[in-house]
Structures are given as structure tokens and as C-alpha cells.
């Protein structure tokens, strides 16, 4: 499939927050249209959908992929791109129009959480090359690799995310799910046996949580 080099592939993630967040998509779309942005957009439809759509866009030749969503959607998108068959993954620009509850990536990079400046930033082709981290692990007997842009949590942090995702089905709101996860773990002090190697240093022991971040100075 041949795609114009300047055309955006936009993935809108409607589940990234509340009804107010979903409503803002119409305003974002109208603003992109008013700016003459050439784009195709697709809407995610459930768990794993953003990753699958990002992979399809990368395979179909889109070299600017824009996520309208939060940190979770952004993480799924980078995995879709990295797991795609595109030969020039390093030339794919991943943009973000913050539209979720958690926008840590945008805040860290000083990106506006307002959609108009975010769209303008992408239009002006303001690019920065950053690292992509990855984590190899086993899910049962199956070896897997996941990529990340912000951080990867092992132990307590990962447990909180897992419980949040599970309880979100019942609470419906991510914030309440997060509070429920914290409450359920408040009396739990589970330690994990780990062996960490950081450069030439080895750390062995029972550890509650580890957070590995990509930081820039």
C-alpha cells in the first residue's frame, strides 16, 4: 500500500478515560480539519486493538502515527510499531495528542496536554529521537518481549497495574480502580526473589518493587 509521506495515521482510543474525554475527539478532529491536516483515522475497539492498529499502519507505509489517548495507548502503539514488518521503524514518527487520564509521557517531555498545541507541534514536525526500552520475560512457558518508552515496573508496581485493569471492569472509572488496587495491597508486603545486574554491579535479594526508567538529561 502506498501512502503519502506526510499523511498521518491517527488512532483514536475512546476508552482512554471518561465521556468528557470521548467528547473531545470531535473537537480534535475539527481542529485538524481546520489546519488542513491530511490524515486517515481508525478507532480502537478493545484490549490489544491499539497495538494491532499501529502495526497495520506501520506495515501499510504510514510514517507519522498519532495516538489520541493516554499513556496506555501510547505503550500499545510503540509495541505495534516495533513488532511490525516495517524495515525503517527508526523513521516512523510517533506523535501523541493527550486524551487520557494518565499523560505522564507528555508531561515528562514538556508536551502540552491541550490538544491544539499538541496538534500544532506535530504539524510543525518537531521531532526528537529517543530510546525504546524492552523487557524479555516468560508468560508461563511462552517467551515474550514488550517495549516501553517511559518505564517498566517489576513487583508491586506491576501488581497495582494488573489489579487496576481487573477491577476497572467493575468500577468503570480508572481512578476508582487504581484506589481499589492500592487498598487491596495496603497490607500486602510481598517480596520477590530477584537478581539484578546493573553494569558491573550485581544485586541479589528479596525485593518489593523495581522501576526501570528511560531518563534524559
Regions found by a protein language model. Give the residues of each.
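Short Gly/Thr/Asp-enriched flexible loops that form oxyanion-binding sites at enzyme active sites
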Residues: 73-86
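Conserved small/polar residues in nucleotide/adenosyl-binding loops
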Residues: 216-217
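Short alpha-helical
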Residues: 48-49, 72, 155
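ATP/NTP phosphate-donor binding region
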Residues: 1-68, 79
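Short, glycine/acidic-enriched loop or turn micro-motifs at the edges of active sites
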Residues: 16, 74, 101
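Catalytic core of DAGKc-family lipid kinases
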Residues: 35, 83-212
Amino acid at each position: 500500500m502506498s501512502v503519502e509521506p506526510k499523511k498521518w495515521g491517527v488512532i483514536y482510543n475512546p476508552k482512554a478515560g471518561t465521556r468528557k474525554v470521548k467528547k473531545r475527539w470531535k473537537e480534535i478532529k475539527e481542529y485538524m480539519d481546520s489546519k488542513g491536516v491530511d490524515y486517515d483515522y481508525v478507532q480502537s475497539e478493545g484490549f490489544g486493538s491499539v497495538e494491532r492498529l499501529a502495526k497495520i499502519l506501520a506495515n501499510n507505509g504510514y510514517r507519522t502515527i498519532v495516538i489520541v489517548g493516554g499513556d496506555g495507548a501510547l505503550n500499545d502503539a510503540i509495541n505495534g510499531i516495533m513488532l511490525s514488518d516495517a524495515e525503517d521503524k527508526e523513521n516512523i514518527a510517533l506523535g501523541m495528542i493527550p486524551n487520557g487520564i494518565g499523560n505522564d509521557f507528555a508531561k515528562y517531555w514538556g508536551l502540552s496536554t491541550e490538544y491544539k498545541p499538541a496538534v500544532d507541534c506535530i504539524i510543525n514536525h518537531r521531532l526528537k529521537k529517543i530510546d525504546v526500552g524492552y523487557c524479555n520475560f516468560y508468560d508461563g512457558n511462552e517467551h515474550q518481549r514488550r517495549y516501553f518508552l517511559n518505564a517498566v515496573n517489576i513487583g508491586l508496581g506491576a501488581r497495582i497495574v494488573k489489579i487496576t485493569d481487573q477491577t476497572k471492569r467493575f468500577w468503570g472509572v480508572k481512578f476508582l480502580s487504581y484506589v481499589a488496587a492500592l487498598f487491596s495491597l495496603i497490607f500486602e508486603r510481598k517480596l520477590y526473589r530477584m537478581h539484578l545486574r546493573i553494569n558491573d554491579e550485581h544485586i541479589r535479594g528479596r525485593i518489593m518493587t523495581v522501576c526501570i526508567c528511560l531518563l534524559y538529561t
